[in-house]
């Protein structure tokens, strides 16, 4: 059932819904401003007191997804304007090839997709994609979703069973859910195909040494000079 097909007209849950819209979303937004999560997108955060983290982007995406759910039931121009500003800051970091992760683009450009198990790149991509789907539903504006579709196309070019691609999968599952939602939203099979690949590829090797994360760790240790 779509969220716009449901209405809560009275009682406890109506009160909670109104509290979420008028208080909770803005309280979380204030926390994100204070901790530098939004400023980090443009590099204006304090690098010591507001040291960037690999999954700050996903925090913003989850906040906005909640806002977009609320906006699908009741328009909110103030909230839409705030989210629109954050979206612009996020997609301004998109690279020419479609890659979109401010942390790695700004701080570790040589480490993209080198530690899928621990570094949350695909996890962040998933939350951004989920948020973009709900943004499109709430506003009709496709700029966020268009940017995320470009990122998905980039991910498709990097991962898969085809020769030259990485046979990896996310350490923290999340993008699979987002890809299915994107497929349901657009009916574009590429989203479903990528989700299916990530799900089916996980845990397919009988020998521990054949698992992607084991091979990935070996490459990282070689890069850092821990092994020859």
Task: Set out the residue ranges of the language-model regions.
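Glycan-recognition and catalytic cores of secretory/periplasmic carbohydrate-active enzymes
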Residues: 1-228
């Amino acid at each position: 059932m779509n969220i716009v097909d449901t209405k809560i007209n009275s009682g406890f849950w109506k009160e909670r819904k109104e509290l979420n819209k008028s208080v909770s979303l803005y309280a979380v937004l204030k926390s994100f401003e204070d901790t530098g999560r939004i400023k980090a997108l443009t590099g204006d955060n304090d690098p010591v007191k507001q040291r960037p983290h690999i999954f700050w982007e996903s925090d913003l995406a989850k906040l906005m997804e909640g806002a977009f759910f609320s906006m699908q039931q009741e328009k909110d121009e103030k909230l839409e304007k705030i989210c629109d500003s954050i979206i612009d800051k996020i997609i301004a970091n998109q690279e020419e090839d479609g890659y979109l992760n401010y942390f790695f683009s700004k701080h570790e450009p040589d480490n993209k997709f080198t530690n899928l198990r621990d570094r949350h790149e695909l996890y962040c991509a998933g939350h951004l994609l989920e948020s973009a789907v709900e943004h499109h539903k709430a506003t009709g504006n496709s700029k966020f979703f268009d940017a995320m579709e470009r990122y998905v196309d980039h991910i498709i070019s990097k991962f898969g069973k085809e020769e030259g691609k990485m046979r990896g999968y996310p350490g923290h599952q999340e993008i699979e859910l987002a890809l299915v939602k994107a497929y349901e939203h657009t009916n574009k099979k590429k989203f479903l195909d990528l989700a299916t690949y990530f799900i089916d590829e996980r845990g397919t090797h009988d020998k521990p040494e054949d698992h992607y994360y084991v091979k990935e760790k070996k490459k990282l240790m070689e890069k850092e000079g821990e092994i020859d």
